């Protein structure tokens, strides 16, 4: 397995394990959706550095359009929340590294700025 794929799997699994320690999910289907969400999240944030920047650019643009169209909410977050955390009546943001470190709470739009940065990076690498 190539080093980039190992880094990707490590970051995904590490983030997922921290997440389920903070917010346990007691549902097998919910855990599968949550792990897939962590895969997508790590790809969005690091995929351009690890893999093909053109494919990454396409995924990032689709993600941004989805967030904008869906009132800054991710369908994967809503889906996993409905299965793992039905007690939350309001939207519970996805627990990724930036939220775990308190960055999302201090700078709620930081994801948009970071994705703007990775778009510029991807365009430079294409």
Predicted regions, residues:
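Hydrophobic alpha-helical cores of multi-pass transmembrane domains in eukaryotic membrane proteins
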Residues: 8-17, 39-42, 58-68
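Alpha-helical transmembrane segments and their cytosolic membrane-interface
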Residues: 1-21, 81, 104-115, 126
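Core segments of transmembrane alpha-helices
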Residues: 34-46, 108-121
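Hydrophobic alpha-helical membrane-embedded segments
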Residues: 51-77
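Long, highly hydrophobic alpha-helical transmembrane signal-anchor segments
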Residues: 25-58
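Juxtamembrane "helix-exit" motif on the non-cytosolic side of transmembrane helices
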Residues: 17-26, 68-72, 123-126
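Solvent-exposed, well-ordered amphipathic alpha-helical segments
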Residues: 1-6, 50-57, 121-126
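Membrane-proximal soluble regions of multi-pass membrane proteins
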Residues: 69-108
């Amino acid at each position: 397995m190539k080093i980039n794929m190992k880094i990707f799997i490590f970051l995904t699994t590490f983030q997922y394990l921290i997440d389920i320690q903070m917010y346990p999910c007691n549902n097998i289907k919910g855990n599968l959706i949550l792990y897939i969400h962590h895969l997508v999240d790590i790809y969005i944030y690091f995929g351009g550095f690890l893999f093909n920047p053109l494919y990454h650019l396409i995924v990032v643009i689709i993600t941004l359009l989805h967030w904008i169209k869906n009132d800054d909410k991710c369908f994967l977050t809503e889906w996993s929340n409905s299965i793992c955390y039905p007690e939350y009546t309001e939207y519970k943001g996805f627990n990724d590294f930036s939220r775990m470190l308190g960055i999302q709470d201090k700078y709620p739009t930081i994801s948009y700025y970071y994705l703007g940065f990775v778009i510029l990076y991807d365009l430079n690498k294409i």
